Every structure is written in C-alpha cells, then in structure tokens.
C-alpha cells in the first residue's frame, strides 16, 4: 500500500518528463525522497529553511532560503509541492544558463514588476552575504552588500534608470562570470560556463 503512494502516476510522470531535464527513473527517485522528507507532500517555508541551513552550516541561510522558497512556490500557496520542487530543481541544476538567469531574475524581482530595483538587489545580496561571508573573503570593492550592489548596477544598468530589466540582467550576468557565480550562489565554482 505505501509503495503505491511513493510512485508517480503515469500522467504526472509524463508532465514532469516534458517540463524537466530528469529521466523517469530520476523523477521516481526524487519523488520517493521528497515523500520521505515531506510525508504530507508539501514543504513549508520553515521546513525548507531547516533543509537549506544544512548546506550553509557556517552562515545564516534563513533569509536567502525564504527568497528561494518564494521562487520555488510558483502558485503562491505558501508551500512547495513535488511538481514545484522538481521543476525548480531541474532549472537550477540542469537548466541552460539563460533559464538559470531567468530563474535568478524572478528571485531578485521581489515585487514581481518585471524589474530589479537597487533595493531588491541589496536585499538579496545582504541575504547572500549573511549566508557565506564567514567562509568567503570578498574583494575590497565588494566588501559590503552595498558595494556589491553598486558594482552590479554599474555593470548591468546600461540605460541608467536605476532598475534592471530582464534583458539588462541577462546581458550583464553573461558578460561577467563572477556575477553568474554570485547569482547562482556558487562561489566555489570557477569555470562552470
């Protein structure tokens, strides 16, 4: 009986096959693990923050985890179901650079208006610094979240309107691998793209 519940139904599997980069076997394995960790089939923000904290034991990942959670929770119901989880995981782990950048843009665009303001960028950068600053030495021109935000805006805000469009964000990130690494919160990777 329990085994039947831990397998994806054929129509769900078909949907996920079409919307992710995972194989049927990988989807089934992820689903089993998801149900093991989330028996209700839904992940709350508090549960998500606890899981996320395991990946960043030397920093405070809670604020950044809230932003990631919001971006995973595409229907805005305050929980992440398996479909939301696996689609976001597919984009962030196996998606093409452009997909990852669109996903990152949606995380940085806190109010969903299609632009990233300086304040929105600063909020995310502050969350990243809280998470990694104890284990990462930042260059002098990025030693504070404010300096990092200013540097990003100088590089990306090509029309100087004080906000970043999706186009500016993607173009700017693609032209600076260090920004791509920061946006993906993967400071250890040096030549991912």
Swiss-Prot record:
Annotated positions binding Ca(2+) 2: 109, 111, 113, 115, 120
Keyword annotations: Calcium, Lipoprotein, Metal-binding, Myristate, Repeat
Domain EF-hand: 41-58, 60-95, 96-131, 144-179
Lipidation positions, renumbered (N-myristoyl glycine): 2
Binding site for Ca(2+) 3: 157, 159, 161, 163, 168
Single annotated GO MF: calcium ion binding
Residues engaged in binding Ca(2+) 1: 73, 75, 77, 79, 84
Comment field (misc): Probably binds two or three calcium ions.
Annotated family: Belongs to the recoverin family.
Protein name stated in the entry: Hippocalcin-like protein 1
